Amino acid sequence: MALKASPVTGLFPPLRPTASSSPSTSSNRPCSLRILPLRTSFFGNSSGALRVNVLRLACDNRLRCNGHGATMNLFERFSRVVKSYANALISSFEDPEKILEQTVIEMNSDLTKMRQATAQVLASQKQLQNKYKAAQQSSDDWYKRAQLALAKGDEDLAREALKRRKSFADNATALKTQLDQQKGVVDNLVSNTRLLESKIQEAKAKKDTLLARARTAKTATKVQEMIGTVNTSGALSAFEKMEEKVMAMESEADALTQIGTDELEGKFQMLETSSVDDDLADLKKELSGSSKKGELPPGRSTVAASTRYPFKDSEIENELNELRRKANDF
């Protein structure tokens, strides 16, 4: 902000700034306070009045420019953010297959328009060419008429014929210029049409490739999404639980088999024990029923025994003697 001085007297309100005082001059002018004597009849010749420069505030143009620039910068940033979000939203809705189809359709539409424009230009060129030929023919005809009139001695008629001939010749020259320009336009249109046709063919071939790639990418994405939704850890934990359960069932079956085998072996051991006890009881009876200790029961003789078992086993004999000793103790 700049301070602007405006001189006033003590009797009148402050004066407004004039058109001659520019803002740049007032902004660079320092603030000042001037005291000048004023001689009036109201105060008397000896009295002095003070004329004070009233201070006014003026807006600095530089601050205005800075504020305007900051506002524009903020607006541009906001506009950029909005455009970025809009582009992201539009990109999310874009389907490559539909976009490619629409692009090919638009290119075919442009090709149709270009062909129509080429046809119109060719028709216009044909008209110009016909007009040029007609003007050239008229120019030649009037030249022949001028020759004929001059041969007949009518110079005035020959002069008029030459004027007509010049008019048609000028028209033919102008038509020739337009025709040359038209040929350049036609050549350019034909070249661009052929180029667009080749581009469309290339775009169609590329469209098929891109569509195949897009479909493959979509399929791969769906497969990955399906794989991502599968809880692999849960499936593995379920397999581990089932494995533990199967192992527990196998252990239980082995235990039951072992228990059944132990019971069977126990039964056979009991049978063997009972047979041994029976043999021991029979042996006791035989020993207790004999008349003399150490005498064999009736029907048994040493000869028969020796005859039956010709070879004696020392271990068996020792066991037998031990049994005899125990029987005598009883």
Swiss-Prot record:
Transmembrane segments: none annotated. The keyword Nucleotide-binding does not apply. The keyword Transit peptide applies. Keywords: Chloroplast, Coiled coil, Membrane, Plastid, Plastid inner membrane, Thylakoid, Transit peptide. Residues 1-64 form a transit peptide. Its main location: plastid. It is a peripheral membrane protein. It is found in: Plastid, Chloroplast inner membrane; Plastid, Chloroplast thylakoid membrane. GO terms for cellular component: chloroplast; chloroplast envelope; chloroplast inner membrane; chloroplast nucleoid; chloroplast stroma; chloroplast thylakoid; chloroplast thylakoid membrane; nucleus. GO terms for biological process: thylakoid membrane organization; vesicle organization. It comes from the Eukaryota. InterPro entries: PspA_VIPP1 (IPR007157). Residues 287-312 are annotated as: Disordered. Disruption phenotype: Pale green and unable to grow photoautotrophically on soil. Decreased thylakoid content. Residues 124-259, 312-329 form a coiled coil. It holds the Pfam family PspA_IM30. Belongs to the PspA/Vipp/IM30 family. Homomultimer. Complex formation involves interaction via the central alpha-helical domain (71-286). Required for plastid vesicle formation and thylakoid membrane biogenesis, but not for functional assembly of thylakoid protein complexes. This is Membrane-associated protein VIPP1, chloroplastic. It comes from Arabidopsis thaliana (Mouse-ear cress). The gene is VIPP1.
